[in-house]
Curated annotation (Swiss-Prot):
Residues in HTH deoR-type domain copies: 6-70
Lineage: Bacteria, Bacillati, Bacillota, Bacilli, Bacillales
Organism domain of life: Bacteria
One function term, GO molecular function aspect: DNA binding
Gene ablation phenotype (knockout): Relieves catabolite repression of gapB and pckA transcription. Disruption is epistatic over a yqfL deletion.
DNA-binding region: 23-42
Keyword Ligase listed: no
Domain CBS: 83-139, 148-211
Repressor keyword on record: yes
Species assigned in the record: Bacillus subtilis (strain 168)
Name assigned to this protein: Transcriptional repressor CcpN
GO biological process: carbon catabolite repression of transcription
Record's function text: Transcription repressor that binds to the promoter of gapB and pckA genes, preventing their expression. Acts as a regulator for catabolite repression of gluconeogenic genes.
Length: 212
């Protein structure tokens, strides 16, 4: 089933190109008794969506791809930089109590921990904070660096990475978020985050044809 809803005219255009391609826009317009200008938006949608390919001085070709294939092609091209969120960062000497408050107030599931040089040194998840709160420790006096997951046991990503690869990391590592980092002389600077929520938003945008 196609993930992109086409109107009757667009379906008719596809059928014409299937049967006559390669075919120019002018010839398609003639077969529909319409002007080339009238068809321009429909041809643009079909081309950007991947149903058709256009070559200068040759015309339009039918790609033969299904809606599922087109969706997969789009997903493979999406990069982290276009969908990353703002990270929530705390200092490594912050107390576990304050970290819990920050997580609640910011409404996030993962906190990224940095040192005094703003370099990534750890990650705190809900599970880490829950585990600490169940214990007998005084949460206001225990710094987060005691309970956090430390480098180099942290999976990171960069702005140029592909969304599909990040989705696989989230599933394989069973984690909710990855820090988006930038390399510096001192280490990794956190410049963003990618979460399971980001992935859900991408799928919704694709289903509503907001990503072409």
């Amino acid at each position: 089933m196609s993930t992109i809803e086409l109107n009757k005219r667009q379906e008719h255009i596809l059928q014409i190109v299937k049967e006559n391609g390669p075919i120019t826009g002018e010839h398609i317009a003639e077969k529909l008794n319409l002007t080339r200008a009238t068809l321009r938006p429909d041809l643009a949608i079909l081309t950007m969506s991947g149903f058709l390919e256009a070559r200068p001085r040759v015309g339009y070709f039918y790609t033969g791809k299904t809606g599922t294939q087109l969706l997969a092609d789009k997903l493979k091209k999406l990069q982290v930089k276009d969908f990353q969120s703002i990270p929530v960062v705390i200092h490594e000497n912050v107390s576990v109590y304050d970290a819990i408050c920050t997580m609640f107030l910011e409404d996030v599931g993962t906190l990224f921990v940095v040192d005094r040089d703003a370099v990534l040194v750890g990650v705190l998840s809900r599970k880490d904070l829950l585990r600490a709160s169940i214990g007998q420790q005084e949460l206001t006096s225990v710094p987060v660096h005691i309970i956090m997951t430390r480098m180099p046991n942290i999976t990171v990503c960069r702005r140029e990475d592909y969304v599909m690869d990040i989705a696989k990391h989230l599933i394989e590592k069973q984690i909710d978020a990855l820090p988006v980092i930038k390399d510096t002389d001192k280490g990794f600077e956190v410049i963003g985050r990618v979460t399971k929520t980001n992935m859900t938003k991408i799928l919704v945008s694709l289903s509503e044809n907001e990503i072409l």
